[in-house]
Amino acid sequence: MGERAGSPGTDQERKAGKHHYSYLSDFETPQSSGRSSLVSSSPASVRRKNPKRQTSDGQVHHQAPRKPSPKGLPNRKGVRVGFRSQSLNREPLRKDTDLVTKRILSARLLKINELQNEVSELQVKLAELLKENKSLKRLQYRQEKALNKFEDAENEISQLIFRHNNEITALKERLRKSQEKERATEKRVKDTESELFRTKFSLQKLKEISEARHLPERDDLAKKLVSAELKLDDTERRIKELSKNLELSTNSFQRQLLAERKRAYEAHDENKVLQKEVQRLYHKLKEKERELDIKNIYSNRLPKSSPNKEKELALRKNAACQSDFADLCTKGVQTMEDFKPEEYPLTPETIMCYENKWEEPGHLTLDLQSQKQDRHGEAGILNPIMEREEKFVTDEELHVVKQEVEKLEDEWEREELDKKQKEKASLLEREEKPEWETGRYQLGMYPIQNMDKLQGEEEERLKREMLLAKLNEIDRELQDSRNLKYPVLPLLPDFESKLHSPERSPKTYRFSESSERLFNGHHLQDISFSTPKGEGQNSGNVRSPASPNEFAFGSYVPSFAKTSERSNPFSQKSSFLDFQRNSMEKLSKDGVDLITRKEKKANLMEQLFGASGSSTISSKSSDPNSVASSKGDIDPLNFLPGNKGSRDQEHDEDEGFFLSEGRSFNPNRHRLKHADDKPAVKAADSVEDEIEEVALR
């Protein structure tokens, strides 16, 4: 369309150019006629060539005055004005105008008019073409819009195809599922139809059988039905009779149960009263035993009245021996139940383990006269020790008898409980048999369950009471052990005359382990009691740890919280006491004068403990005022000697010190001091273990 619009425009421009050139040539050369003829001939030729155009131009010329264009009007006026001006200017010059000029002028005017008409026509055409161009542009814009829409639709075709494919797949799946459902329903319909056919067939058979009344099976069935009804009536009668009997028996059984419960409560109350009486008697016996133990343990202590250093040292050793025996008596009573002789046997190797040490030639040259004196002096010590041992044996016998009585009481209680349980079980079995037969087991279970609940409550209450009683006994034993650990030392008898009697027999001797302990208290442990705390700790650190055999015969018998497989305490105690007697006999034969001499004592300490033991003895002998400095940590039986005048004063002061029991006196402080050296040997630990065992049970 653009090319078509462009081609007529170019033709019109060419025509306008041709007319313009001819018009200018006419105005430029008005005088030349030749040119005018040429100009006149040119439009004529144009008219000849384009006759159609002339007709159209004529039409336009005729139409032009009707609708003159705005552009054409000023051109016409201008041409006319210019023509008039030229004519006015030329009129005086050319007065003699010819006809040729008039013709030329008229031809020019005609030409101008024609050109003006053509211009107006062209302007009209141009306006029409502009309108046409605008309309074509609008059409092009619309067509472009339509094309864009079409292109967009073409682009969307792929998406539409994809969506369409998805819809097709979904529809196919739905179709498949619906087909499967249809098949399943068809199968069900077939099954139901087959079942219906079978049921119809069976129904027809049953109808035929029911219509046939003259069958032999029907008579048999009627007879069986009558017999079953008769049996049912008989069973109902029996059930009624049994239910009545059951009610009567349950009533009688409840009465018996109430009577037995009353008896059980009465027996339980009596048992409580008897248990209280037994406990009261047991506490009384314990208190009496404690009083006897306290009197027997501290009735035969030695007083410290010694005029010489040697006698004072011998008295110290004997007092240490007595304190060891007192500890053994008190602590042996506490832990007799848990003691096992298999763990710590008394072998002759332990007794004679230190004999080879005393066979050296330096210790064999002893003073025989001092041996005689010491032997006769220590003979008097054995009498109170023997009495104490006999009392200890009697106390142990009483303790064992009490244990046997308690065991018998426990066995009786258990037997009574077992009998009651057996009786209840037998009664329950008797009741359950008719209940299971009649099918009314639940009616009789209610009182039985109540009885079981009461029985369980009674058992729980008995267990609680037993546990509380056991805990109370353990607390009392703890209090007793504490009271026995810290007793008050009474005055000891005067053994000076016995120790230093003139009748002494000369005899060589050997030290054993037990005699060494009885002299010095566990390898001379009590030597540290006359020194301050630091020196005692140093000597304790130098000493090697005690072997298990030492626990069998010393100041303490340990308990290891094992009550099973106990041996006979009487045979064990008798063997132990025989050993102590033998050791004391050896002690009476030994010479006390060896230990009283400072040089020989220092040698013995060096052999046993090295240089630390001798340094402690030298510090004791050099420091006479150490008793006053370390009064709280010193054994009251061991004091340092001075000159004779001061010794008598110290003896009087010590007698007053023994009499004042509550004045900064603690006889068991040295035991607590050395408790860290032997942590396994503690009675309190065993009692705590027993408390934990009872709580766990």
From Swiss-Prot:
It holds the Pfam family Lebercilin. Residues 416-432 have a biased composition (Basic and acidic residues). The modification Phosphoserine is found at residues 7, 45. GO terms for biological process: intraciliary transport; photoreceptor cell maintenance; protein transport. Keywords: Cell projection, Cilium, Coiled coil, Cytoplasm, Cytoskeleton, Disease variant, Leber congenital amaurosis, Phosphoprotein, Protein transport, Transport. One of its GO terms (molecular function) is protein-containing complex binding. Residues 1-90, 412-432, 522-548, 606-697 are annotated as: Disordered. It is linked to Leber congenital amaurosis 5: A severe dystrophy of the retina, typically becoming evident in the first years of life. Visual function is usually poor and often accompanied by nystagmus, sluggish or near-absent pupillary responses, photophobia, high hyperopia and keratoconus. Involved in intraflagellar protein (IFT) transport in photoreceptor cilia. Belongs to the LCA5 family. This is Lebercilin. The lineage of its organism: Eukaryota, Metazoa, Chordata, Craniata, Vertebrata.
